[in-house]
Amino acid sequence: MAGVLLVVYAAMVVFWRDPVTSIYTAYEQHEMSSQLDKTFVTWREDARKEIGAPLPPVGTHGGATVAPAVSSASVLRSARRLALRFASIEHGHTGRPLGRIRISRIGLSTIVVENTDYWGSLSKGPGRYEQGSFPGLGRTTGIAGHRTTFAAPFRHIDSIRTGDSIVVEMPYGTFTYRVLRHRIVDNGDWSIMRKVGFDELVLSACHPLYSASHRYVIFARLESVKLPGARDAVRVLPASPATTAA
């Protein structure tokens, strides 16, 4: 009987994910959800004071109404001020919930936590690289996640395609990124967190499955920002064909 259970467990890990650690992560995600919801409410009020009256809608993009492009500079300034304040409070608090990441391509919607400590952070969900930035600061934000254990949020990271959108919902704003390319790098290659001169999102996970020898990395560029209380998203990246995957 024990042998059968072991085979079943191994099969679940190979074809799905580790069920034991996934239960733990599901519990942590549930516990963090109400805490994060309260944080969103608090920052919504702060953002309303920051941005003032909502912008009028003008035109559509991808089915979503967007505000005039001329407003992007002021929205980015507001986002930066809010992000700086948020970072000053949350940076370095290992395991604390920061926001949510949504990737429709792989059916992902999960809470992101601070830092990439194995037990203190990544056991709860994807974690923000502490040496990286925060969305809205105009630099590179990195998020790492497991592929086989602890709910395996990035198990299907290699299914994400160039041109896909990645939405990061922070208490101070919603940031939509457009995927530019992907790379497979050595596990110790930190060039993925280089400065690029624009607001970039980097996702990484161990590669191949069941190995930590390399990392599969997704690079995406900020496309639009929606501050809490604002009526619409504001496009900050001119429409152009996505960069061919490398």
Model region roles, listed by residue range:
Residues G3-A246:
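Solvent-exposed, non-transmembrane regions of membrane-associated and secreted proteins
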